[in-house]
Amino acid sequence: MSSSYINVIGAGLAGSEAAYQIAKRGIPVKLYEMRGVKSTPQHKTADFAELVCSNSLRGDALTNAVGLLKEEMRRLDSVILKSAEATRVPAGGALAVDREGFSQMVTELVTNHPLIEVIREEITEIPEDAITVIATGPLTSDALAEKIHALNGGDGFYFYDAAAPIIDVNTIDMTKVYLKSRYDKGEAAYLNAPMTKQEFMDFHDALVNAEEAPLNSFEKEKYFEGCMPIEVMAKRGIKTMLYGPMKPVGLEYPDDYQGPRDGEYKTPYAVVQLRQDNAAGSLYNIVGFQTHLKWGEQKRVFQMIPGLENAEFVRYGVMHRNSYMDSPNLLEQTFRSKKLPNLFFAGQMTGVEGYVESAASGLVAGINAARLFKGEEALVFPETTAIGSLPHYVTHADSKHFQPMNVNFGIIKELDGPRIRDKKERYEKIAERALQDLQPYLDK
């Protein structure tokens, strides 16, 4: 192809990463982003890589698969990880970021790159003038989504995703909550609102009977387990939340706790955790409380949480439909289209699930778009690495049962030899091997 540049459509986590990876390899990029001229119901700004759900990039330890993926991306010079490290906020053993500061830094680093031209306009056709990376995300505009679905034989996959409410910290009653990380991992980074059994039962009853906002679609509700609305979880059973976001283990009462408790128990019956959402520490989100309740119902029900009786919600929870492709049939392991060889896809639309995973797919697609431009061989990362196993999974899964996938040790190639029974030791060995196997790929 004679074109002198590569198109990247969408400046979310995947698109920003793809554009950066292409530009750092000396190739001009035209980066298209419609926000700024056309907004979406979920985005609040026109900044790149805006986080519309949680502000956490999840676990940071190498014994956690997403922690391993992040370390691999750091070594591959990821602009997303660079920005996350610079804007991190306390979150125990997790990597959480100042939501606005993070997006602003990504925007700045990408926009200021001399080889990246940012064009604020909506793209409604799949370009054929140059090698193109489509990274328009789960909130792809209808016009472009139709073209992508046509590639898929007209079958659009989808699932629903939700975001948790954010609260002004000054409106939390600090006498009813305590600062602690689960099992005291890292610094004490979460505010914990404990509940007695009766408080939990009353809360559960209110939650399952609260009125939900209507969906904008006639299609059947289908949720990704990692971002399930709290009310849907509650309806699965009275104790379901106690094994999920309201799990009390490792969150014992502090010695000076004076509030209500069940007898002499050292651990609450249930706990709601709040996590810092910005660097200033003025905003906190309710961890795991993604929701699609009507806003008035959110206020009524969530103010039943101890300490939140007078809480001011600076953002209510919202839900949106996420589209994803039939990647096993449509994409190569490099995220290159099998049908249109100059086209790459990246981000959640490929069936990777999660912020870090989306950025990782952008990194892989960007590197390979650049290599195609230069006439070089495709770069397929080994399945012994997190960044190699995830693209392999989404492009080799059973198409009939394909669902979005987070990175996890189950999709990374097993260690040779007898299985190590101790999980922590096994994961440490997998991580050690992954980083060794990644080494030869770092300068490509």
UniProtKB/Swiss-Prot annotation:
One BP annotation, GO: tRNA wobble uridine modification
Main location: cytoplasm
SS bond partners: none
Lineage top rank: taxon: Bacteria
Cofactor or coenzyme needed: FAD
Cellular component terms (Gene Ontology): cytosol
Pfam families per UniProt: GIDA (PF01134)
Gene Ontology molecular-function annotations: flavin adenine dinucleotide binding; tRNA (uracil(54)-C5)-methyltransferase activity, 5,10-methylenetetrahydrofolate-dependent
UniProt entry tagged with the keyword Protease: no
PROSITE patterns per the UniProt record, alphabetical: GIDA_2
List of residues binding FAD: 10-15
Enzyme Commission numbers on file: 2.1.1.74
Swiss-Prot/TrEMBL keywords: Cytoplasm, FAD, Flavoprotein, Methyltransferase, NAD, NADP, Transferase, tRNA processing
Keyword Transferase: yes
InterPro entries in UniProt: FAD/NAD-bd_sf, MnmG-rel, MnmG-rel_CS, MnmG_N, TrmFO
Catalytic function, reaction form: uridine(54) in tRNA + (6R)-5,10-methylene-5,6,7,8-tetrahydrofolate + NADH + H(+) = 5-methyluridine(54) in tRNA + (6S)-5,6,7,8-tetrahydrofolate + NAD(+); uridine(54) in tRNA + (6R)-5,10-methylene-5,6,7,8-tetrahydrofolate + NADPH + H(+) = 5-methyluridine(54) in tRNA + (6S)-5,6,7,8-tetrahydrofolate + NADP(+)
Role noted for this protein: Catalyzes the folate-dependent formation of 5-methyl-uridine at position 54 (M-5-U54) in all tRNAs.
Similarity comment: Belongs to the MnmG family. TrmFO subfamily.
Listed name of the protein: Methylenetetrahydrofolate--tRNA-(uracil-5-)-methyltransferase TrmFO
Protein species of origin: Streptococcus sanguinis (strain SK36)
Source species taxonomy: Bacteria, Bacillati, Bacillota, Bacilli, Lactobacillales
Gene name of the record: trmFO
